[in-house]
Amino acid sequence: MELNNLKPAEGSKHAKRRVGRGIGSGLGKTAGRGHKGQKSRSGGFHKVGFEGGQMPLQRRLPKRGFTSLTKEFVGEVRLSDLEKLPVDEIDLLALKQAGLIGEMITSAKIIKTGELKRKVVVKGLGATKGARAAIEAAGGSFAE
């Protein structure tokens, strides 16, 4: 086998459709566009969503909802994530610097997933009942 003998598999390649090249090709004269009408003309097509003058679906349906400007972005942090943190005082800034929550987050809540075996002081963060109990059981505390 040499490079000059390589051929693609039978039927894997298709010849490009050459339209408007005589009646013998089967795609001559009107080139598969039919007779007359907007879609047969060059440059003749409608914009996306145009329904022939009928009120389009996007305008028939009512507008709904709005974007709240006062929306709070609340992040969730697992106990197992707190275990990996190198600091003992945990607040929103420490979580952001560790990359556990995004920059847009304005408040965070600790959830009881995983285990916490070391003593930590949590400042200004919320926690579920189970997470609070687990932190206090490990000798940690909450400073509001």
From Swiss-Prot:
<comment type="function">
    <text>Binds to the 23S rRNA.</text>
</comment>
<dbReference type="GO" id="GO:0003735">
    <property type="term" value="F:structural constituent of ribosome"/>
</dbReference>
<dbReference type="GO" id="GO:0006412">
    <property type="term" value="P:translation"/>
</dbReference>
<keyword id="KW-0689">Ribosomal protein</keyword>
<comment type="subunit">
    <text>Part of the 50S ribosomal subunit.</text>
</comment>
<keyword id="KW-0694">RNA-binding</keyword>
<dbReference type="GO" id="GO:0019843">
    <property type="term" value="F:rRNA binding"/>
</dbReference>
<dbReference type="InterPro" id="IPR036227">
    <property type="entry name" value="Ribosomal_uL15/eL18_sf"/>
</dbReference>
<dbReference type="GO" id="GO:0022625">
    <property type="term" value="C:cytosolic large ribosomal subunit"/>
</dbReference>
<dbReference type="InterPro" id="IPR005749">
    <property type="entry name" value="Ribosomal_uL15_bac-type"/>
</dbReference>
<dbReference type="InterPro" id="IPR021131">
    <property type="entry name" value="Ribosomal_uL15/eL18"/>
</dbReference>
<comment type="similarity">
    <text>Belongs to the universal ribosomal protein uL15 family.</text>
</comment>
<keyword id="KW-0699">rRNA-binding</keyword>
<feature type="compositionally biased region" description="Gly residues">
    <location>
        <begin position="21"/>
        <end position="31"/>
    </location>
</feature>
<keyword id="KW-0687">Ribonucleoprotein</keyword>
<dbReference type="Pfam" id="PF00828">
    <property type="entry name" value="Ribosomal_L27A"/>
</dbReference>
<feature type="region of interest" description="Disordered">
    <location>
        <begin position="1"/>
        <end position="57"/>
    </location>
</feature>
<dbReference type="InterPro" id="IPR030878">
    <property type="entry name" value="Ribosomal_uL15"/>
</dbReference>
<protein>
    <recommendedName>
        <fullName>Large ribosomal subunit protein uL15</fullName>
    </recommendedName>
</protein>
